[in-house]
Amino acid sequence: MSEKNLSNPLVSAIIPTHNRAELLERAIESVLDQSWENIEIVVVDDASDDSTPELLERLKKEHKNIKSIRNKNSRGAAVSRNIAIQNSTGEFVAGLDDDDIWRPNRVEYLLDEFEDGYAAVTSNDRMDFGEKEIVWKKKPVITLQDLLFYNQVGNQVLTKKEYIEAVGGFDESLPSAQDYDLWIRLAHDFGPIKTAPHTLQVVNMSDDRESITTSDNQIEGYLACFNKHQSKMNAAQKKYQHYRIKLTQGEDVGWLEMFRSVPSQLLFKEITRKLFL
């Protein structure tokens, strides 16, 4: 166990949620099952009208390390995450979507990998598409230049609360891609993002569940994030971003355009996506 783990820092697990009580309970249970015991769970209920409020009241009675905040009106994912962070008391913050699951050693392993000079730590993810699962193996170290091609981190990291506060938290003006935007700002100010060499999260990729961020906002958010950061990008990064924007918009991008737009280090990934996904 590292010196950092011997100091036993408190980790705040932040979970925004909206109308997914059954999935939320599963997500919370995966945090309660962590090998790292010094955890608080901060849930922000974004004005759910299902059984979420009752579920949270029951769980808070059963587990003293759970706290919840309820938005009177739906305010979206970014606002809900910021509220959770503001109400957290841990030195470290780790996010979890309400339909995803942490593996039991996630927090312990991420803490063990965190060190000065890095903005955050992520892990490999198991992507659950329902009928099939794919393990997303990420680069051991993800730099700002890597991120300016696309979001190579995914949807969650473990980082210090003070780092998130220093860069201003999640951008509430973005309708989506708020996580991607935050990773860019963290990497810009605090260094690259490290990947723990383990698969520590199961990400629900099913498209039939109501989300706190609607699919209607996905394209708008991606474009807004690109516009916000394109001044940092070189020509190759901009070209690849335009290619991914077309994919996000549902355009049928041919092989020739793919080879013209995709840098060599990303070609295998794009060929695999085009053939099998």
Predicted regions and their residues:
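N-proximal low-complexity "stem/linker" segments adjacent to membrane-targeting elements
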Residues: 1-32
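C-terminal subregions of glycosyltransferases and related glycan-biosynthesis enzymes
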Residues: 2-6, 181, 188, 199-277
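Acidic helix N-cap motif at the loop->helix transition within catalytic regions
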Residues: 22-25, 50-59, 101, 105
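A conserved acidic beta->alpha catalytic loop
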Residues: 30, 37, 45-54, 73, ...
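Glycine-rich, basic loop-to-helix element that forms the pyrophosphate-binding segment
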Residues: 71-88
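Short aromatic/hydrophobic "clamp" motif used to bind/position activated sugar donors
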Residues: 93
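Conserved donor NDP-sugar-binding/catalytic core segment of glycosyltransferases
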Residues: 105-135
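Conserved nucleotide-sugar donor-binding catalytic segment
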Residues: 140-225
